[in-house]
Protein backbone atom coordinates (compact mmCIF):
# COMPACT_ATOMS: atom_id res chain seq x y z
CA UNK A 1 0.00 0.00 0.00
CA UNK A 2 2.76 2.44 0.94
CA UNK A 3 4.48 2.00 -2.41
CA UNK A 4 1.33 2.61 -4.47
CA UNK A 5 0.33 5.56 -2.30
CA UNK A 6 3.68 7.26 -2.87
CA UNK A 7 3.71 6.80 -6.65
CA UNK A 8 1.74 10.05 -6.95
CA UNK A 9 4.23 11.98 -4.79
CA UNK A 10 6.51 13.36 -7.50
CA UNK A 11 8.63 16.07 -5.87
CA UNK A 12 8.99 17.81 -9.23
CA UNK A 13 5.24 18.49 -9.18
CA UNK A 14 5.42 19.72 -5.60
CA UNK A 15 7.84 22.38 -6.78
CA UNK A 16 4.80 24.10 -8.31
CA UNK A 17 3.78 25.10 -4.78
CA UNK A 18 6.81 27.32 -4.38
CA UNK A 19 8.92 27.74 -1.23
CA UNK A 20 6.35 29.88 0.60
CA UNK A 21 3.55 27.29 0.42
CA UNK A 22 5.92 24.47 1.33
CA UNK A 23 7.10 26.46 4.37
CA UNK A 24 3.48 27.02 5.46
CA UNK A 25 2.79 23.29 5.20
CA UNK A 26 5.95 22.40 7.12
CA UNK A 27 5.02 25.00 9.74
CA UNK A 28 1.71 23.19 10.25
CA UNK A 29 3.37 19.77 10.48
CA UNK A 30 6.02 20.98 12.93
CA UNK A 31 3.60 22.86 15.21
CA UNK A 32 1.40 19.76 15.38
CA UNK A 33 4.49 17.72 16.23
CA UNK A 34 5.37 20.12 19.05
CA UNK A 35 1.87 19.66 20.45
CA UNK A 36 2.14 15.87 20.30
CA UNK A 37 5.54 15.79 21.99
CA UNK A 38 4.93 18.48 24.63
CA UNK A 39 1.55 17.13 25.81
CA UNK A 40 2.30 13.39 25.65
CA UNK A 41 4.03 13.13 29.06
CA UNK A 42 1.08 14.99 30.64
CA UNK A 43 -1.55 12.69 29.12
CA UNK A 44 0.36 9.40 28.85
CA UNK A 45 -1.11 7.79 31.98
CA UNK A 46 -4.65 8.93 31.16
CA UNK A 47 -4.31 7.51 27.65
CA UNK A 48 -3.33 4.08 28.94
CA UNK A 49 0.37 4.35 29.78
CA UNK A 50 3.34 5.55 27.75
CA UNK A 51 4.59 2.02 27.05
CA UNK A 52 1.24 1.05 25.54
CA UNK A 53 0.37 4.23 23.65
CA UNK A 54 3.55 5.75 22.24
CA UNK A 55 3.36 3.74 19.01
CA UNK A 56 -0.31 4.57 18.37
CA UNK A 57 0.35 8.23 19.18
CA UNK A 58 3.20 8.35 16.67
CA UNK A 59 0.92 6.69 14.12
CA UNK A 60 -1.70 9.37 14.79
CA UNK A 61 0.91 12.07 14.22
CA UNK A 62 1.79 10.45 10.90
CA UNK A 63 -1.89 10.77 9.99
CA UNK A 64 -2.03 14.40 11.10
CA UNK A 65 1.11 15.17 9.12
CA UNK A 66 -0.04 13.51 5.91
CA UNK A 67 -3.29 11.54 6.08
CA UNK A 68 -4.80 8.21 7.08
CA UNK A 69 -2.58 6.24 4.70
CA UNK A 70 0.47 7.24 6.72
CA UNK A 71 -1.26 6.15 9.92
CA UNK A 72 -1.92 2.73 8.44
CA UNK A 73 1.72 2.47 7.35
CA UNK A 74 2.90 3.05 10.92
CA UNK A 75 1.04 -0.08 12.07
CA UNK A 76 3.77 -2.19 10.44
CA UNK A 77 6.62 0.17 11.22
CA UNK A 78 6.03 0.61 14.97
CA UNK A 79 4.81 -1.59 17.87
CA UNK A 80 1.20 -0.37 17.86
CA UNK A 81 -1.20 -1.65 20.52
CA UNK A 82 -4.56 -2.53 18.92
CA UNK A 83 -6.62 -0.91 21.68
CA UNK A 84 -4.62 2.30 21.63
CA UNK A 85 -4.79 2.31 17.84
CA UNK A 86 -8.57 2.06 17.99
CA UNK A 87 -8.69 5.08 20.30
CA UNK A 88 -6.33 6.97 18.01
CA UNK A 89 -8.62 6.21 15.07
CA UNK A 90 -11.59 7.54 17.06
CA UNK A 91 -9.66 10.72 17.82
CA UNK A 92 -8.59 11.05 14.20
CA UNK A 93 -12.20 10.87 13.02
CA UNK A 94 -13.58 13.22 15.70
CA UNK A 95 -10.92 15.89 15.29
CA UNK A 96 -11.03 15.71 11.50
CA UNK A 97 -14.76 16.43 11.35
CA UNK A 98 -14.57 19.18 13.97
CA UNK A 99 -11.52 20.77 12.37
CA UNK A 100 -13.09 20.98 8.92
CA UNK A 101 -16.17 22.67 10.41
CA UNK A 102 -14.12 25.17 12.43
CA UNK A 103 -11.92 26.15 9.50
CA UNK A 104 -14.94 26.65 7.25
CA UNK A 105 -16.45 28.84 9.97
CA UNK A 106 -13.18 30.81 10.17
CA UNK A 107 -13.38 31.84 6.51
CA UNK A 108 -15.41 34.94 7.36
CA UNK A 109 -12.69 36.05 9.79
CA UNK A 110 -9.88 35.77 7.22
CA UNK A 111 -9.67 39.52 6.73
CA UNK A 112 -9.10 40.12 10.44
CA UNK A 113 -6.43 37.38 10.61
CA UNK A 114 -4.67 38.71 7.52
CA UNK A 115 -4.75 42.25 8.85
CA UNK A 116 -3.32 41.18 12.22
CA UNK A 117 -0.55 39.19 10.50
CA UNK A 118 0.01 41.71 7.69
CA UNK A 119 -0.41 38.78 5.30
CA UNK A 120 1.16 38.86 1.85
CA UNK A 121 -1.16 37.34 -0.79
CA UNK A 122 0.38 38.98 -3.84
CA UNK A 123 1.69 35.74 -5.42
CA UNK A 124 -1.22 33.48 -4.48
CA UNK A 125 -2.98 33.61 -7.85
CA UNK A 126 0.19 32.68 -9.75
CA UNK A 127 0.82 29.68 -7.48
CA UNK A 128 -2.82 28.59 -7.83
CA UNK A 129 -2.63 28.70 -11.63
CA UNK A 130 0.54 26.57 -11.69
CA UNK A 131 -0.90 24.05 -9.22
CA UNK A 132 -4.19 23.71 -11.09
CA UNK A 133 -2.34 23.13 -14.36
CA UNK A 134 -0.35 20.29 -12.77
CA UNK A 135 -3.42 18.65 -11.23
CA UNK A 136 -5.35 18.89 -14.52
CA UNK A 137 -2.72 16.73 -16.25
CA UNK A 138 -3.55 13.81 -13.95
CA UNK A 139 -7.35 14.07 -13.97
CA UNK A 140 -7.56 13.84 -17.77
CA UNK A 141 -6.33 10.22 -17.87
CA UNK A 142 -8.75 7.37 -17.04
CA UNK A 143 -7.52 3.97 -15.76
CA UNK A 144 -8.36 0.65 -17.43
CA UNK A 145 -8.23 -3.02 -16.41
CA UNK A 146 -4.66 -3.43 -17.65
CA UNK A 147 -3.48 -0.62 -15.35
CA UNK A 148 -5.09 -2.31 -12.34
CA UNK A 149 -3.62 -5.73 -13.15
CA UNK A 150 -0.16 -4.26 -13.65
CA UNK A 151 -0.31 -2.42 -10.32
CA UNK A 152 -1.43 -5.54 -8.45
CA UNK A 153 1.53 -7.49 -9.84
CA UNK A 154 3.93 -4.63 -9.19
CA UNK A 155 2.88 -4.25 -5.56
CA UNK A 156 3.33 -7.98 -4.91
CA UNK A 157 6.86 -7.88 -6.33
CA UNK A 158 7.74 -4.72 -4.39
CA UNK A 159 6.31 -6.24 -1.19
CA UNK A 160 8.49 -9.34 -1.53
CA UNK A 161 11.63 -7.31 -2.24
CA UNK A 162 10.91 -4.88 0.60
CA UNK A 163 10.45 -7.69 3.13
CA UNK A 164 13.81 -9.18 2.15
CA UNK A 165 15.61 -5.82 2.24
CA UNK A 166 13.96 -5.03 5.58
CA UNK A 167 15.45 -8.17 7.14
CA UNK A 168 18.92 -7.33 5.78
CA UNK A 169 18.72 -3.72 7.01
CA UNK A 170 17.51 -4.89 10.41
CA UNK A 171 20.51 -7.19 10.74
CA UNK A 172 22.85 -4.33 9.86
CA UNK A 173 21.32 -1.88 12.35
CA UNK A 174 21.34 -4.48 15.11
CA UNK A 175 25.02 -4.96 14.46
CA UNK A 176 25.73 -1.26 15.09
CA UNK A 177 23.47 -1.06 18.16
CA UNK A 178 20.45 0.78 16.70
CA UNK A 179 17.62 -1.22 18.29
CA UNK A 180 14.85 1.20 17.23
CA UNK A 181 15.22 0.09 13.60
CA UNK A 182 13.43 -3.26 13.77
CA UNK A 183 12.32 -5.25 10.71
CA UNK A 184 9.04 -3.35 10.31
CA UNK A 185 10.72 0.04 10.58
CA UNK A 186 13.43 -0.89 8.08
CA UNK A 187 10.86 -2.25 5.61
CA UNK A 188 8.75 0.90 5.87
CA UNK A 189 11.74 3.21 5.36
CA UNK A 190 12.94 1.23 2.34
CA UNK A 191 9.55 1.04 0.61
CA UNK A 192 8.92 4.75 1.30
CA UNK A 193 12.20 5.76 -0.34
CA UNK A 194 11.56 3.34 -3.22
CA UNK A 195 8.08 4.78 -3.76
CA UNK A 196 9.34 8.36 -3.82
CA UNK A 197 12.03 7.44 -6.35
CA UNK A 198 9.61 5.52 -8.60
CA UNK A 199 7.18 8.45 -8.48
CA UNK A 200 9.63 10.37 -10.66
CA UNK A 201 9.62 7.60 -13.30
CA UNK A 202 6.87 6.61 -15.78
CA UNK A 203 5.38 4.47 -12.97
CA UNK A 204 4.23 7.68 -11.32
CA UNK A 205 2.06 8.48 -14.34
CA UNK A 206 -0.05 5.31 -14.19
CA UNK A 207 -3.69 6.45 -14.14
CA UNK A 208 -4.95 3.85 -11.62
CA UNK A 209 -2.56 4.81 -8.81
CA UNK A 210 -4.95 7.06 -6.86
CA UNK A 211 -7.89 4.65 -6.98
CA UNK A 212 -5.76 1.60 -6.19
CA UNK A 213 -4.08 3.22 -3.17
CA UNK A 214 -7.51 4.24 -1.82
CA UNK A 215 -8.76 0.64 -2.01
CA UNK A 216 -5.66 -0.58 -0.15
CA UNK A 217 -6.06 2.14 2.48
CA UNK A 218 -9.70 1.35 3.28
CA UNK A 219 -8.96 -2.37 3.55
CA UNK A 220 -5.92 -1.99 5.82
CA UNK A 221 -7.49 0.54 8.20
CA UNK A 222 -10.63 -1.60 8.50
CA UNK A 223 -8.60 -4.72 9.32
CA UNK A 224 -6.53 -2.92 11.95
CA UNK A 225 -9.55 -1.32 13.62
CA UNK A 226 -11.37 -4.67 13.76
CA UNK A 227 -8.75 -6.11 16.13
CA UNK A 228 -9.77 -3.79 18.99
CA UNK A 229 -12.63 -4.39 21.42
CA UNK A 230 -15.32 -1.86 22.32
CA UNK A 231 -13.99 -1.77 25.88
CA UNK A 232 -10.80 -0.17 24.57
CA UNK A 233 -12.84 2.80 23.35
CA UNK A 234 -13.74 3.76 26.96
CA UNK A 235 -10.43 5.63 27.15
CA UNK A 236 -11.22 7.56 23.97
CA UNK A 237 -12.57 10.67 25.81
CA UNK A 238 -9.10 11.45 27.16
CA UNK A 239 -7.71 10.91 23.69
CA UNK A 240 -10.12 13.56 22.44
CA UNK A 241 -8.98 15.99 25.16
CA UNK A 242 -5.37 15.25 24.17
CA UNK A 243 -6.20 15.92 20.53
CA UNK A 244 -7.93 19.20 21.30
CA UNK A 245 -4.89 20.26 23.33
CA UNK A 246 -2.64 19.50 20.35
CA UNK A 247 -4.90 21.57 18.10
CA UNK A 248 -4.76 24.49 20.54
CA UNK A 249 -0.96 24.42 20.56
CA UNK A 250 -1.05 24.21 16.76
CA UNK A 251 -3.28 27.29 16.39
CA UNK A 252 -1.27 29.43 18.81
CA UNK A 253 2.07 28.57 17.22
CA UNK A 254 0.70 29.01 13.68
CA UNK A 255 -0.58 32.47 14.59
CA UNK A 256 2.87 33.39 15.89
CA UNK A 257 4.52 32.09 12.71
CA UNK A 258 1.96 33.92 10.59
CA UNK A 259 2.75 37.15 12.40
CA UNK A 260 6.46 36.66 11.79
CA UNK A 261 6.28 35.51 8.14
CA UNK A 262 3.02 37.25 7.12
CA UNK A 263 1.10 34.10 6.20
CA UNK A 264 -2.57 34.39 5.26
CA UNK A 265 -5.41 32.40 6.85
CA UNK A 266 -6.41 30.75 3.56
CA UNK A 267 -3.10 28.97 3.10
CA UNK A 268 -2.69 28.32 6.84
CA UNK A 269 -6.08 26.59 6.89
CA UNK A 270 -5.45 24.70 3.65
CA UNK A 271 -2.09 23.43 4.90
CA UNK A 272 -3.58 22.44 8.25
CA UNK A 273 -6.32 20.35 6.61
CA UNK A 274 -3.80 18.94 4.11
CA UNK A 275 -1.91 17.62 7.15
CA UNK A 276 -4.85 16.02 8.94
CA UNK A 277 -6.95 14.98 5.95
CA UNK A 278 -4.68 14.73 2.93
CA UNK A 279 -5.28 15.72 -0.67
CA UNK A 280 -8.96 14.74 -0.59
CA UNK A 281 -9.82 17.28 2.12
CA UNK A 282 -7.51 20.25 1.57
CA UNK A 283 -9.30 21.47 -1.60
CA UNK A 284 -12.52 21.81 0.43
CA UNK A 285 -11.00 24.57 2.54
CA UNK A 286 -9.00 26.10 -0.31
CA UNK A 287 -12.05 26.50 -2.54
CA UNK A 288 -14.03 28.04 0.32
CA UNK A 289 -11.77 31.07 -0.19
CA UNK A 290 -11.42 30.90 -3.96
CA UNK A 291 -12.37 28.20 -6.45
CA UNK A 292 -9.04 28.54 -8.22
CA UNK A 293 -7.09 27.45 -5.11
CA UNK A 294 -8.13 23.77 -5.31
CA UNK A 295 -4.86 22.69 -6.93
CA UNK A 296 -2.83 24.12 -4.06
CA UNK A 297 -4.80 21.98 -1.62
CA UNK A 298 -4.26 18.83 -3.68
CA UNK A 299 -0.50 19.33 -3.96
CA UNK A 300 -0.18 20.14 -0.25
CA UNK A 301 -1.94 16.87 0.50
CA UNK A 302 0.46 15.00 -1.77
CA UNK A 303 3.39 16.61 0.05
CA UNK A 304 2.00 15.35 3.35
CA UNK A 305 1.68 11.81 2.01
CA UNK A 306 5.31 11.95 0.88
CA UNK A 307 6.79 12.97 4.24
CA UNK A 308 4.22 11.60 6.69
CA UNK A 309 5.96 8.25 7.17
CA UNK A 310 9.28 9.87 8.02
CA UNK A 311 7.63 12.31 10.44
CA UNK A 312 5.73 9.46 12.10
CA UNK A 313 8.90 7.43 12.58
CA UNK A 314 10.68 10.48 13.98
CA UNK A 315 7.85 11.13 16.43
CA UNK A 316 7.95 7.48 17.45
CA UNK A 317 11.64 7.77 18.31
CA UNK A 318 10.91 10.86 20.43
CA UNK A 319 7.87 9.48 22.25
CA UNK A 320 9.70 6.25 23.06
CA UNK A 321 11.97 8.34 25.29
CA UNK A 322 9.08 8.62 27.77
CA UNK A 323 8.74 4.84 28.13
What is the role of each PLM region?
Residues 1-20, 189-204, 210-235:
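Hydrophobic transmembrane alpha-helices of secondary-active transporters
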Residues 18-197, 231-240, 244-275, 279-323:
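Alpha-helical transmembrane segments of multi-pass small-molecule/ion transporters
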